[in-house]
Structure formats: structure tokens, C-alpha cells
């Protein structure tokens, strides 16, 4: 049993060989926040020792850390969909598309983490630490899935209601690449504007 220093307090069931050749090098990568490099080392170890509980747990942990890093990057960015006033919503199409793609990356990596955990639980179903970690990852996946779905629904449904032409300049709108503003004009109707056209409207008023 080996306890990893400074990362988490879960005992790892690894042989001395696994510890020397894979766990210790992976933890050195992780100490420098290179979780992708750490995961590569662990995956190499699992190619040689596919049933190692310790390496499987490290795989799930480093997948989680990669997902967490992407999530932190996204939280530092401006929100791609944000209200400007009552009944007015600004949508940055390019950033929304980018963020939806990054959400998918996070979901995939967390799915890989969950898969590694499930492999451990097949061998050792009463491992409380691993069971708790799986519950945590499941809750993360559920939250991300809801956020992604809400963003996708706003992004895809709103243009269907508002149409494809800017009220200001009457030119076509590319929702995938342009920043646009939706303005509610009644309980069932929406206007859509290019952001510069909407700003011009504000300057006139």
C-alpha cells in the first residue's frame, strides 16, 4: 500500500515495481501540474499492468484533474450568453461554440475517470474511498450535462424564434460566428440584432 504525498490521502494498491516505474514518475509530473503527462505515464503502466488497482485509481484521479483544469479555464472566460437588460440577451456565437466543445472534452475525460473507477469496483466493490469518488464524479457529470444542455438549447432554439436577419441592417446573421443580441418584443416574439447594430440603436435613443 502506497500513499501518494500531497495529492490525496487514498492508499494505492501497487506493487513495488508499479510504484517505482509508474506511480512515482506520474506524481512528479503531477507536482508540476502536468496532469496530461502524469496520465500518459499511468496509461503506460496500465498497458503493462492492466489489473493494477492503484494505477486505475490514479488514472481516474488524473482524468478528474484534467477536467478540473479545463473547467477552471472556462470559468475565467467572459460568459458567452449573458443578459444585457430585461428581455435582452447577448450571445457570442463563436465563444458559445468553443465552450460547448470544451464541455464535451470535460465530459469525455470525466467519463474516462468513471470507467477506471468502475473497473476497480468490479474487483473490489467495497472500496469506500473509490465509491465516494465515483459519486463525486457522477455529480460533476450531471451538473456539466445540465449546463451544456441549457447553453445548447438557448443557442439553437432562440434563432428559430427570432429568424436569421438583423432587424437593424436587414443582413443575414451567422449565429455560429457572430455576437448577436436578442430582444423580446412580446410574450411570443423576439428580435435579433448584430451587436454593433444594437449598439447604434442605443446611441440613437
Walk through the language-model features, giving the residues of each.
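Alpha-helical segment of the N-proximal tetratricopeptide repeat
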Residues: 15-44, 48, 93, 100-101
